[in-house]
């Protein structure tokens, strides 16, 4: 008996049955794979169905709750729907929004209330968004509508205080201004409005007249002290000159009268005729009269006519002893 055959059996025993088994296994694997895929899809569809059912229930609940309130405020609800549509249709133009209030701020609620959500209905032609909220939404929307109805101040106000154009005060215009001020009783009584009405000049505003009148008043007030001081100086000088003139005149008349008295007394004592004494006194008086006239002309600037003094003297006759 041989332990090891001389030629080993190298033929593979491959039967058709083995191939069939492999095919069956592969088919089973494919079926399991398909079932697995179908299982995932069925689970997803179940979840979708559940979520859609929940959504439908919530919609029915909210619609039932809102139906009671919409019956009383149907017009108000329609206006709110129009506002919502206009919000989504609005777009800013060059960075400036068309609406002044941020209307979307009124739709946010506190953390305790459930968050609102949107859903879309697509029918191939139209897609619309609607806001689904809790019953508190109607109260907030009502407040928003009431705030929008109130009148609000404009956002962009016009510039205030437009500056008036500059006005050139010519000599003729200033003369016209001074004439109007004088007609109104002087710069202290004149008012800018009355001066403007009296002048009646084109393109002349109240601001122009007011500033010019203020400058005119300051100039007039500064000129007053200088003129008053000049007048007082002139008056003082005239008084001094008059006093000097009076002193000179009194001195001259006193000197001439004393000389005449002395001469008359001497002639009377010697027994000379009075008429000759008067002639001599007149001859001596001539240089004094000339000096008086020259002094008075230098003081006054004119040469006035000198008046002859009163020469009527009462001379007592001497008592001649026999």
From Swiss-Prot:
Signal peptide: none
Alphabetical GO biological process terms: abaxial cell fate specification; regulation of DNA-templated transcription
Source superkingdom: Eukaryota
Entry keywords, A to Z: Developmental protein, Differentiation, DNA-binding, Nucleus, Transcription, Transcription regulation
Molecular function (Gene Ontology), one example: DNA-binding transcription factor activity
Feature: compositional bias, Polar residues: 224-241, 299-322
Keyword Transcription set for record: yes
Compositional bias ranges of the Basic and acidic residues kind: 17-35
Stretches that traverse the bilayer: none
Tissue-level expression: Expressed in developing phloem.
HTH myb-type domain sequence ranges: 161-221
Family annotation (InterPro entries): Homeodomain-like_sf (IPR009057), KAN_fam (IPR044847), Myb_dom_plants (IPR006447), SANT/Myb (IPR001005)
Residues of the DNA-binding region: 192-217
Subcellular location: Nucleus
Gene3D superfamilies: Homeodomain-like
Sequence segments annotated as region (Disordered): 1-35, 222-244, 267-322
Keyword Transcription: yes
GO cellular component: nucleus
Role played: Probable transcription factor that regulates lateral organ polarity. Plays a role in lateral root formation and development.
Protein name, UniProt field: Probable transcription factor KAN3
Gene: KAN3
């Amino acid at each position: 008996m041989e332990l090891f055959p001389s030629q080993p059996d190298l033929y593979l025993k491959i039967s058709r049955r083995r191939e069939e088994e492999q095919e069956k296994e592969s088919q089973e694997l494919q079926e399991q794979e398909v079932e697995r895929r179908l299982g995932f899809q069925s689970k997803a569809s179940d979840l979708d169905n559940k979520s859609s059912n929940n959504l439908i229930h919530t919609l029915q609940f909210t619609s039932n709750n809102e139906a009671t309130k919409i019956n009383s405020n149907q017009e108000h609800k329609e206006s709110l729907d129009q506002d919502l549509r206009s919000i989504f249709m609005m777009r800013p133009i060059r960075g400036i929004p068309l609406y002044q209030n941020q209307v979307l701020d009124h739709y946010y609620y506190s953390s305790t209330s459930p968050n609102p959500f949107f859903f879309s209905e697509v029918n191939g032609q139209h897609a619309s968004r609607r806001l689904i909220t809790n019953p508190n939404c109607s109260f907030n929307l009502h407040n928003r509508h009431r705030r929008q109805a109130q009148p609000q101040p404009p956002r962009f106000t016009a510039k205030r205080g437009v500056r008036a154009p500059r006005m050139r005060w010519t000599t003729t215009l200033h003369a016209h201004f001074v004439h109007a001020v004088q007609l109104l009783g002087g710069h202290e009584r004149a008012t800018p409005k009355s001066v403007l009405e009296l002048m009646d000049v084109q393109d002349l505003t109240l601001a122009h007249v007011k500033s010019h009148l203020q400058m005119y008043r300051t100039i007039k007030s500064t000129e007053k002290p200088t003129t008053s001081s000049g007048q007082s100086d002139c008056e003082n000088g005239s008084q001094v000159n008059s006093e000097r003139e009076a002193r000179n005149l009194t001195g001259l008349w006193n000197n001439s009268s004393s000389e005449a008295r002395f001469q008359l007394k001497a002639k009377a004592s010697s027994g000379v005729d009075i008429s000759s004494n008067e002639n001599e006194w007149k001859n001596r008086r001539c240089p004094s009269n000339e000096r008086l006239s020259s002094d008075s002309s230098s003081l006054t600037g004119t040469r006035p006519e000198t008046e002859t003094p009163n020469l009527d003297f009462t001379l007592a006759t001497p008592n001649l002893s026999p």
